[in-house]
């Protein structure tokens, strides 16, 4: 893991956001490795208190980059030798979605980081919502298309888990019926 930008942890005098950004806290590869070297969990969490409360981010990271170490190499991710840059999108309030602007700043940070490291980039956007028109013209759709054309960037967006639940519907409303 080359870094974690946790937008849910407010910046302090000791904990800063990434350069050029105003919210959250950036934990560097050095911070993460120093925390992992500590056996005491509370001390480790003092250094890097970012956690995946739902397990979803960990699950998605395993699919992308799992090494198979816990399964004797049987279950590996798509790219087990890749570097991981975590952006925990922002809203410290339970059961709420991050703002579109937080996703956009996360993508911007990832692209800038990949460019600075001269590395290709795959961004996995795996959080669900049903915002917008879904016709390719919403601000987030336009932004992601533009970002995907910059540098060596692929952006993968989950299509949802709703199946046939009719989250979106179409029809004609008839007055007084």
Question: How should these model regions be labeled?
Answer:
Residues 91-177:
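Substrate-binding/access-modulating region of protease and related hydrolase catalytic domains
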Residues 1-101, 118-119, 152, 167:
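Subtilisin-like serine protease catalytic core
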């Amino acid at each position: 893991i080359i870094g974690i930008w946790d937008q849910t942890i407010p910046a302090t005098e000791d904990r800063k956001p990434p350069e050029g950004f105003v919210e959250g806290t950036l934990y560097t590869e050095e911070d993460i490795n120093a925390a992992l070297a500590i056996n005491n969990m509370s001390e480790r969490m003092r250094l890097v208190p970012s956690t995946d409360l739902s397990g979803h981010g960990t699950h998605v990271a395993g699919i992308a980059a799992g090494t198979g170490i816990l399964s004797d190499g049987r279950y590996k991710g798509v790219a087990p030798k890749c570097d991981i840059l975590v952006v925990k999108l922002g809203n410290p309030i339970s059961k709420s979605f991050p703002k579109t602007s937080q996703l956009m700043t996360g993508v911007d940070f990832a692209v800038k980081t990949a460019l600075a490291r001269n590395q290709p980039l795959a961004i996995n956007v795996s959080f669900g919502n049903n915002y917008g028109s879904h016709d390719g013209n919403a601000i987030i759709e336009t932004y992601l298309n533009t970002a995907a054309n910059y540098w060596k960037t692929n952006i993968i967006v989950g299509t949802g888990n709703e199946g046939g639940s009719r989250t979106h519907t179409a029809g004609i409303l008839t007055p007084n019926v």
